[in-house]
Amino acid sequence: MKAYTYSSVALAVTISLLAGCGGGSGSSNTPPVVTTPTTPTTPVTTEPEWEAGVYEPQSQYLAKCETPRSGIDPFTNRAYPDTQGTAMDEKLWLRTWTNDTYLWYDEVDDNDPANFSVLGYFDQLKTNELTPSGTPKDNFHFSQDTAEYNELSQSGISSGYGFDWEFGSTTVPRVLTVRFTEPGSPAATAGVPRGATLSRINGVDFVNDNTQQGVNAINAALFPEDAGTVTSFEFVQVDGSTLSVDITSGDISVTPVQNAKVLDTENGKTGYFQFNTFIVTAQEGLIDAFDMFVEENVTELVIDLRYNGGGRLALASQLSYMIAGPNQTNNATFETLRFNDKNPNTNPVTGETIRPTPFYRNVIDYNAGQLTDTFLP
């Protein structure tokens, strides 16, 4: 039995993953330090040309990379499809892809890609319109390195120190606060508490240093390229005291489901857990939590989603089934994806016909892409 809808589309359907040429590192939550914009390189004669309002087929630029990957993709066991191209090929693919698949494609400014780096160009390929409440219509526009995404979403591994940060201000005076640390991570082992704010890193004033040298040093320290990098952090804790620690970066095992417990209240037993991300490895933790809730006969449930950034829709369907149960979900639709008016019936990412997603009541073998015969609690 095939589980036909569990792509890595985040819960907000405006999120997109950049898989072409390995993607990049960027986010709607900008890095803690704003860097000087990249100066565009001088185009070479072999580059394709941009023409305002003219969109060539995606296939003309697909997998043409300025720096092609080679060898076998460890997550697909297939050869990388990359061929030699240019930065302009990458940017024009992003442009055409956005025009074909983006929900608000007709609200995207068609700016000359020669004026941007690849990631800088993608960052502005979105609507700038606001909702009636004044918030950005698209609040989930970001790119991510493909290998990093696959490692996190499929294996639950993320590189770094184990911090989950709250980006308060990315310009001076900067504010970067620890929301929580991953259990067993270097950050947790160092005893850095929730609510601590970063004040210095490797001796650099994180809050106020606005020199280019300082900016570069801060970004390099916060986002080390290699595991085993030792970084000196200085934090101001909630009580005003200072905490100085040296932390070594590594491959962090992400725990999506944390702090599952049963609380005795005046209304009876209440189940609680913190749920941070809808990735494949969350399935086991969710099942364990709900097995406990069933055994303890909880009558109320609290799910802490404050730090959840979305993830797989199939997991959201499974979680919803475990909350609502079979009587409320039998033969019901969990969700139906809606794309732009160019794609009313077909998913432009997968090429499959758009069909409603049910409430999945079974454990899913995500590696095989199959529903198993085992029922969820």
Predicted stretch roles:
Residues 1-9:
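Bacterial N-terminal signal peptides that target proteins for export
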Residues 256, 310-377:
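Gly/Ser/Thr-rich loop/hinge elements
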Residues 25-32, 40-301, 307-309, 314-315, ...:
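Flexible, low-complexity junctional segments that flank or bridge functional domains
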Residues 13:
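A glycine-rich, hydrophobic loop/mini-helix early in the fold
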Residues 9-10, 90:
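Alpha-helical structural motif
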Residues 17-20:
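C-terminal motif of bacterial Sec signal peptides marking the signal peptidase cleavage site
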